[in-house]
C-alpha cells in the first residue's frame, strides 16, 4: 500500500458487542458502522465521543441496532455532522428498527437516551445508494471511492469496498451470507479478489451450522406439535430484517394444504408492522431472483401475505383467535412485545418459545440459549401505569402551575406588543400631514383616532372596566383565531376535558391503550418465574458458517486481514486458519478494544508535519500525475492540538501516481535528541493515539543552508524502450530494435543493462546529445 491506513476499534472486538470502528485512509476518516448494544452501554458512546469531530463519513452496513443503533445519539447529543452512506433499504428499514426500539423501551420505562426526532434528524443525513453504485469522494477524500455490494444477511445489507486512487482496495465485510435464501440472494464475491485489506468478523468462525432443510423441518415440527396441543408459539424476531425471511417461510407453509395449518392463526406483532410490510412491497428489486420472477411473471407481490395478520399492540393480538403463532420483536427479550408475551406464556407447558437470533451475552434470550436446562429465572417486570390518588393530584397541580406560568408569560408578551402598538399609534397621531385613505377592509385603528393639538400625557380610559381589544395584524391581514370558527357541538366540555386529563374514562379499555396523553409513571419489580414452556433455539440469523467463511477468505486472498466482532477463541481459530493457507503472503491482525492497527505495508511512509518555510523552498518536478521534490531537513517534536488528519505525508506530497517517492536527508549530527524522539513517535506504539486533544507529532524543519549536504541526482519514472522509440520517431530520428538494443540513426545504441538501468552508447556527435536530452526528459530528476 502507498497510503497510510489505520483502524481504531471503538467497540466490537474480542467480544460479541455492537460494531463500531474508525478507519483512517491518509487524511480521511471513515466510521464503519455505529452500533449500540441491547443494554445501551455508555462505554461505546465514551469511545465515540473522543473521535466524533474527526469523522468525515459514516458507512452503514446493516439496518439493525447492532450496526446503527448509536447513530441518533451521535447526531443528536455528540454533534456528529458528516456524510452518512447507506443503501436505500438500510435507510428505510433502519428507521423502522429505531422507531420500534424506541417505542418498545418507552412503553415500559422512562427512556431518554434519544427521541424519535433524533432518529429523524440522523436519518435525514443519510445519502441513499444502490448496489454497485460508485461514489467518488471530494475534498479530503479526493481519490477515494466507495461502492456498496450485497452482503446477503438482511435486505440492503452491505459489503463496503473502498478504493484509493484505483489501486488500494479495502473491503469491510461483516455479517455476510453466501447462501441464497427465500427473500435474498447470497453475497457477491467475484468483485472482491485480492484486496489490499480485508476487515471481517469471526462471529461464526467456530460455529457448525445445521443444514437449512433440517432447520425448516425442526421449525415446522415444533409449530405443529404446539398448535395441535392447543398451545401458542412465540417466535422472537427482529423488527425489519430477518423477520422477512421467517414471514415468507411461514406464509408459504400456511399456503400448503398438506401442512394443515390453515385453521390456525399467524400474526406479526411490533409497533411498525404495517410499515415494514409496505416498505417490503416497494423493495422487491433488492430481493432474490425467485421473488423477482414471481413478481414479474404473476404480477403478484410476494409480501401480499394471505395468512399473516399485522398487529401493532397486544389489543390487536387479543382479537386474533388462539392457538396462534406470533412473530414478535425484540429478539433479545429485553423489551418489546416479545418480552411481554414471554412473561405471559412461559409458565404454560402447552406453549412454545422459539429463539432465532443469538443476541449479545447478558440478554434474556442469550441466557435461555446458553442455559437450556435452567427452568427458573429472575425477571424484571416493567410497565407503565396511570397516576392515581395523591400522585395524580400532585401531577395535575404541577401542570396547572406550569400552564399558569406559561399563560402569564404569554400575557406579558402580549402587553409588550400592545404597548409598542400604542406608541406606534401615538406617533401616527403626531403626523399632521398623514394622508387618510379609504379601504374596503377595516385597517387597524382607522376611524378611532381623534386629532389633538396637545399630546396627551396619559391615555384616558372609560370609567368602567372596558379594555379595548386591539386587532392584531400581520402581512396577510387580521390574525384569525381558530377557536372562533369551531362548531359548538364538537367542542368538549370542561368536565370531559378534566376526565381525560385525570384518566377517568368509562368502559372497557384495551390492555395496551395509548397512554401518551394520560399522566403515567413507570414501575419495576423483580420476580422469580418458572419456565414451563418449551424453549428452542433455531438458527435463522442468515450468516455464513465457519467453514464457508474460511473458504471465502482463502478465495479472496487478501494481503492483510483484520479480524473483529467475535469471541476470542473464534478470532484465534480464524487467524490460525488464515495464516495456515496464506503463509507469508498474508498479515493477520486481531486488535484489542481501543487499539489502533497500522495496516500501512510500505515501511517508508510516515506522517510528519512540514513547516511552511520548508514547503516554500521545495522545487517540484512532474512525473506522470505526481510532483516530486528532494527534501533536506531535520525531525523535531512539537505539541499540537491540530488534528493529525491534516498532516502532509512524507511518502505522498502532492502525489497521485504509483511511482512517487520522497527522500529525506536528516543528518545525525543535528539535534540528536529531537531525532530520537521523532523516530520513537514514528516507529513507536500507534495504539496510544486515541484521538486525544493534544498529540506529539514529528515536524520536519529545514536545515541551515551551510548544513545542507549535496546528493547525487535521482532519476525517477524510468521509461520503457518501446515508449522511448515512439518519442524518437516523433522527433524525426530513425530508431529500430536490433537484438533487444534500440539503434538510433545507426550511430547511437540505447540498451537496458542486467541491473535494469538504461545505458547510452555511441560516438560523440550531435545525435548523441540530442538523444540523451530526449532520454532525460522522460525522467523526473531530483
From Swiss-Prot:
Gene: CPSF2
Cited Pfam families: Beta-Casp (PF10996), CPSF100_C (PF13299), Lactamase_B_6 (PF16661), RMMBL (PF07521)
Cited SMART domains: Beta-Casp, Lactamase_B
Organism: Bos taurus
The protein's name in its UniProt record: Cleavage and polyadenylation specificity factor subunit 2
Biased composition regions of type Basic and acidic residues, renumbered to the chain: 407-416, 439-449
GO cellular component: mRNA cleavage and polyadenylation specificity factor complex
Family, similarity comment: Belongs to the metallo-beta-lactamase superfamily. RNA-metabolizing metallo-beta-lactamase-like family. CPSF2/YSH1 subfamily.
Ranges of biased composition (kind: Acidic residues): 417-430
Subunit structure, interactors included: Component of the cleavage and polyadenylation specificity factor (CPSF) complex, composed of CPSF1, CPSF2, CPSF3, CPSF4 and FIP1L1. Interacts with CPSF3, CSTF2 and SYMPK. Interacts with ZC3H3.
Compartment(s): Nucleus
Amino acid at each position: 500500500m502507498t497510503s497510510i491506513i489505520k483502524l481504531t476499534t471503538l467497540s466490537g472486538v474480542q467480544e460479541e458487542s455492537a460494531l463500531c470502528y474508525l478507519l483512517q485512509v491518509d487524511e480521511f476518516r471513515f466510521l464503519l458502522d455505529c452500533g449500540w448494544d441491547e443494554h445501551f452501554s455508555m462505554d461505546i458512546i465514551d469511545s465515540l465521543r473522543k473521535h466524533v469531530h474527526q469523522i468525515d463519513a459514516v458507512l452503514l452496513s446493516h439496518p439493525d441496532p447492532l450496526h446503527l443503533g448509536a447513530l441518533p445519539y451521535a447526531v443528536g447529543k455528540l454533534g456528529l455532522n458528516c456524510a452518512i452512506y447507506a443503501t436505500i433499504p438500510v435507510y428505510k428499514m433502519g428507521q423502522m428498527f429505531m422507531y420500534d426500539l424506541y417505542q418498545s423501551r418507552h412503553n415500559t420505562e422512562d427512556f431518554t437516551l434519544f427521541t424519535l426526532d433524533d432518529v429523524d434528524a440522523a436519518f435525514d443525513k443519510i445519502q441513499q445508494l444502490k448496489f454497485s453504485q460508485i461514489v467518488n469522494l471530494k475534498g479530503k477524500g479526493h481519490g477515494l471511492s466507495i461502492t456498496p455490494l450485497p452482503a446477503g444477511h438482511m435486505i440492503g445489507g452491505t459489503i463496503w469496498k473502498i478504493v484509493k486512487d484505483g489501486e488500494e482496495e479495502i473491503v469491510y465485510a461483516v455479517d455476510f451470507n453466501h447462501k441464497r435464501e427465500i427473500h435474498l440472494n447470497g453475497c457477491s464475491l467475484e468483485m472482491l479478489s485480492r484486496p489490499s485489506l480485508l476487515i471481517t468478523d469471526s462471529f461464526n468462525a467456530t460455529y457448525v451450522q445445521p443444514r437449512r432443510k433440517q432447520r425448516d423441518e425442526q421449525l415446522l415440527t415444533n409449530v405443529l406439535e404446539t398448535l395441535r396441543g392447543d398451545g401458542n408459539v412465540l417466535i422472537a424476531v427482529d423488527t425489519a430484517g430477518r423477520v422477512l425471511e421467517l414471514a415468507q417461510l411461514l406464509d408459504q407453509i400456511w399456503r400448503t394444504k398438506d401442512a394443515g395449518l390453515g385453521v390456525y392463526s399467524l400474526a406479526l406483532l411490533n409497533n411498525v408492522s404495517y410499515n415494514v410490510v409496505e416498505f417490503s412491497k416497494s423493495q422487491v428489486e433488492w430481493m432474490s431472483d425467485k421473488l423477482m420472477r414471481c413478481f414479474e411473471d404473476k404480477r403478484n407481490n410476494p409480501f401480499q401475505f394471505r395468512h399473516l395478520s399485522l398487529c401493532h399492540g397486544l389489543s390487536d393480538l387479543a382479537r386474533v383467535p388462539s392457538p396462534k403463532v406470533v412473530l414478535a420483536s425484540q429478539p433479545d427479550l429485553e423489551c418489546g412485545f416479545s418480552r411481554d408475551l414471554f412473561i405471559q406464556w412461559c409458565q404454560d407447558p402447552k406453549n412454545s418459545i422459539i429463539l432465532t437470533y443469538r443476541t449479545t451475552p447478558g440478554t434474556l434470550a442469550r441466557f435461555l440459549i446458553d442455559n437450556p436446562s435452567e427452568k427458573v429465572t429472575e425477571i424484571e417486570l416493567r410497565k407503565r401505569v396511570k397516576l392515581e390518588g395523591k400522585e395524580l393530584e400532585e401531577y395535575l397541580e404541577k401542570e396547572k402551575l406550569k400552564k399558569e406560568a406559561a399563560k402569564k408569560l404569554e400575557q406579558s408578551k402580549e402587553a409588550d406588543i400592545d404597548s409598542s402598538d400604542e406608541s406606534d399609534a401615538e406617533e401616527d397621531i403626531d403626523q399632521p400631514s398623514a394622508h387618510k385613505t379609504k379601504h374596503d377592509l377595516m385597517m387597524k385603528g382607522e376611524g378611532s383616532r381623534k386629532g389633538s393639538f396637545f399630546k396627551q400625557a396619559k391615555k384616558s380610559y372609560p370609567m368602567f372596566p372596558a379594555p379595548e381589544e386591539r386587532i392584531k395584524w400581520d402581512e396577510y391581514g387580521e390574525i384569525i383565531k381558530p377557536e372562533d370558527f369551531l362548531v359548538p357541538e364538537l367542542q368538549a366540555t370542561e368536565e370531559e376535558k378534566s376526565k381525560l386529563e385525570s384518566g377517568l374514562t368509562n368502559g372497557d379499555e384495551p390492555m395496551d391503550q395509548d397512554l401518551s396523553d394520560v399522566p403515567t409513571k413507570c414501575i419495576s419489580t423483580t420476580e422469580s418465574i418458572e419456565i414451563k414452556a418449551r424453549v428452542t433455539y433455531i438458527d435463522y440469523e442468515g450468516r455464513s458458517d465457519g467453514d464457508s467463511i474460511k473458504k471465502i477468505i482463502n478465495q479472496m486472498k487478501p494481503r492483510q486481514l483484520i479480524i473483529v466482532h467475535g469471541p476470542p477463541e473464534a478470532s484465534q481459530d480464524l487467524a490460525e486458519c488464515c495464516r495456515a493457507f496464506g503463509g507469508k503472503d498474508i498479515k493477520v491482525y486481531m486488535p484489542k478494544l481501543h487499539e489502533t492497527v497500522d495496516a500501512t505495508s510500505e515501511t517508508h511512509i510516515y506522517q510528519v508535519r512540514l513547516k511552511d518555510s520548508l514547503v516554500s523552498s521545495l522545487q517540484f518536478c512532474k512525473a506522470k500525475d505526481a510532483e516530486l521534490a528532494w527534501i533536506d531537513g531535520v525531525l523535531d517534536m512539537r505539541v499540537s492540538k491540530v488534528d493529525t488528519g491534516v498532516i502532509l505525508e512524507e511518502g505522498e506530497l502532492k502525489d497521485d501516481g504509483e511511482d512517487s517517492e520522497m527522500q529525506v536527508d536528516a543528518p545525525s549530527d543535528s539535534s540528536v535528541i529531537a531525532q530520537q524522539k521523532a523516530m520513537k513517535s514514528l516507529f513507536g506504539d500507534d495504539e496510544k493515539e486515541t484521538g486525544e486533544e493534544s498529540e506529539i507529532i514529528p515536524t520536519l524543519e529545514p536545515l541551515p543552508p551551510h548544513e545542507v549536504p549535496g546528493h547525487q541526482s535521482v532519476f525517477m519514472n524510468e521509461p520503457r524502450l518501446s515508449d522511448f522509440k515512439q518519442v524518437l520517431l516523433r522527433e524525426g530520428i530513425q530508431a529500430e530494435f536490433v537484438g533487444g538494443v534500440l539503434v538510433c540513426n545507426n550511430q547511437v545504441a540505447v540498451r537496458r543493462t542486467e541491473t535494469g538501468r538504461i545505458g547510452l552508447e555511441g560516438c560523440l556527435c550531435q545525435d548523441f546529445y540530442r538523444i540523451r536530452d530526449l532520454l532525460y526528459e522522460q525522467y523526473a530528476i531530483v
